[in-house]
A protein has these predicted regions:
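Short, functionally important structural connectors and interaction interfaces within domains
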Residues: 53, 189-192, 222, 286, ...
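Universal eukaryotic N-terminal targeting presequences
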Residues: 1-2, 314
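Rossmann-fold cofactor-recognition segment
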Residues: 49-63
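Short amphipathic alpha-helical/adjacent loop interface patches that line ligand
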Residues: 96
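Oxidoreductase cofactor-interface core, primarily capturing Rossmann-like NAD(P)-dependent enzymes
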Residues: 2-47, 62-72, 79-93, 101-112, ...
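NAD(P)-dinucleotide binding in Rossmann-like oxidoreductases
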Residues: 250-252
Length: 315
């Protein structure tokens, strides 16, 4: 058997990178091996990956030299950033620059960069339908990623631009799950009206990324993934069915959502408005059938709920 191609995974202890690492490790005959980047090889998450067969390497996306060392001898690399750790487009741009330069220096043959749209292509700063944030962005956590695509192109790194969707896991971890109103009734609240919102299970993002690495014909291309395109009402109905409690869908205006006051509420309010205002463009870029071709295990929203129903906080 030929030697396995090494895929270096940033964010290996997080949702996207962890899903990719587990997908590769679950396919011992797939021809790929995992080198997981971690800042702490003694963390429980790092040890869990090592137990599955991952090679651990200590590196940091803020340290370009450490990335060059981590990428040495690898075939491919999965690059992802976590905007919500710092809320800084400038920091994100610096991290992506480090990744792109390190990938070029290491001779990476296939990079998969987890990105999103630069919404300013649709909503220029002069468009007042939504507020401009941090002086020069509409949806900072989208725009910073989309703007950074050029780092890989300019560096000459063979890259697939991998556009993700709304994580359904946000209903578990990000405080978006059903909340009780004054009368005790449960509801999810989103500023989406009756528009469809492409979404996906976080674990499926990693599985789809694995599918991309098996498709060198996707180098130089932009791809988008989703498990389903449900409306808010459809998600509430699925929750009611699977969780066994009546759950309503409350649609609010983007202005109301932006006013909720939690960290990032303005960014997310603008994001949901972008989803709704450009429903056709955003959805068309995220084909469920294409996603399933990358990942035959792709879950629908109801299937994901069924697996995770005990993890969704209520109230």
């Amino acid at each position: 058997m030929s030697e396995k191609k090494i895929i270096v995974v940033t964010g290996a202890t997080g949702a996207q990178g962890g899903g990719l690492a587990r997908a590769i490790l679950a396919d011992p005959n797939g021809g790929f091996a995992v080198r997981a980047i971690t800042r702490d090889p003694n963390s429980d998450a790092s040890k869990a990956l090592a137990a599955l067969g991952a090679e651990l390497v200590v590196a940091d996306v803020d340290d370009e030299a450490s990335l060059v060392r981590a990428l040495d001898g690898a075939y491919g690399a999965f690059f992802v950033t976590f905007f919500w750790a710092h809320f800084s487009p400038a920091k994100e741009a610096a991290q992506v620059g480090n990744m792109a330069r390190a990938a070029k220096a290491a001779g990476i043959k296939h990079a998969v960069w987890s990105t999103l749209e630069d919404t300013r292509r649709w909503v220029p700063l002069s468009d007042n339908r939504m507020p401009t944030l941090q002086e020069k962005f509409k949806v900072p956590h989208f725009d910073a990623k989309g703007e950074s695509n050029a780092r890989f192109t300019e560096a000459g790194v063979p890259t697939t631009f991998f556009h993700t969707s709304f994580y359904w896991d946000n209903f578990i971890h990000f405080g978006m799950g059903p909340k009780a109103g004054p009368d005790g009734s449960l509801a999810i609240t989103l500023p989406m009206g009756d528009k469809k919102m492409p979404g996906i299970a976080a674990e499926d993002i990693g599985r789809c990324a694995y599918g991309v690495f098996k498709r060198p014909d996707l180098i130089g291309q932009s791809v988008g993934i989703a498990g389903e395109h449900p409306t808010g009402a459809e998600m509430a109905a699925a929750m009611s069915k699977v969780l066994g409690k009546p759950i309503a869908y409350h649609s609010v205006s983007p202005e109301t959502y932006r006013s909720f006051g939690f960290p990032g509420a303005d960014d997310l309010g603008n994001m949901f408005q972008f989803y709704a205002d450009f429903e056709e463009d955003f959805g068309k870029a995220r084909s469920v059938s294409f996603s399933r071709s990358l990942n035959p295990q792709l879950q629908s929203f109801e299937a994901w709920l069924t697996v995770n129903k005990d993890r969704i906080p209520l109230g």
